[in-house]
């Protein structure tokens, strides 16, 4: 039911050598190095613990993730109404940076979100943009060892994608400007709903 979301997330998966794990456990396995599966550029939601250092007690006990996972149907519907309009013919063609920002819109990091907090308008994604979630759309509520998973059958347009920089995520021919703006670390400034902007977006050819 949520395999598309998982596949998109796993498309950023990498195995990273972990010195802490290697020092503690590699010898017991008869190897020199142990690797940890992480998601490059995204929160490592596949890891039970936020750090492999058992000495970092504060981080181990305080960090959790809350994921609002759209169903396969919801993602397909969003693709048809957003990315297909922007010139993409399939989800597999969507630019990785646009997908990265898309996934971030459904992650609340740092602490656990309880059901009564959803829909209050106070939740922000890890990128600092408001999380637009209608509690009535949630059909799965699962507590996990490292946070909470909420499943939903519909997607309200993510706030960053409805902002002035939304066309950068949507249109294929705006990808060059998306990377330029992303490299400047200014995207989060333009997704704020506290200020109004007018943005002129050059195409790749320009």
Question: Model-flagged regions — what are they?
Answer:
Residues 1-206:
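Mature, structured domains of secreted/extracytosolic soluble proteins
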């Amino acid at each position: 039911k949520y395999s598309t979301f998982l596949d998109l997330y796993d498309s950023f998966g990498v195995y990273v050598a972990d010195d802490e794990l290697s020092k503690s456990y590699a010898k017991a396995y008869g190897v020199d190095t142990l690797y940890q599966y992480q998601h490059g550029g995204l929160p490592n939601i596949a890891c039970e613990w936020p750090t492999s250092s058992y000495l970092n007690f504060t981080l181990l006990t305080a960090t959790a993730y809350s994921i609002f996972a759209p169903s396969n149907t919801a993602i397909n519907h969003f693709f048809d109404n957003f990315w297909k309009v922007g010139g993409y013919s399939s989800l597999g063609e969507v630019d990785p940076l646009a997908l990265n920002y898309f996934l971030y819109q459904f992650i609340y990091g740092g602490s656990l979100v309880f059901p009564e907090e959803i829909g209050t308008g106070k939740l922000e994604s890890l990128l600092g943009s408001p999380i637009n979630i209608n509690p009535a759309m949630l059909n799965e509520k699962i507590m996990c060892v490292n946070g909470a998973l909420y499943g939903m059958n519909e997607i309200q347009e993510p706030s960053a994608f409805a902002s002035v920089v939304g066309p950068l995520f949507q249109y294929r021919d705006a990808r060059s400007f998306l990377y330029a703006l992303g490299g400047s670390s200014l995207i989060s400034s333009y997704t704020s709903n506290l200020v109004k902007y007018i943005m002129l977006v050059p195409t790749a050819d320009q």
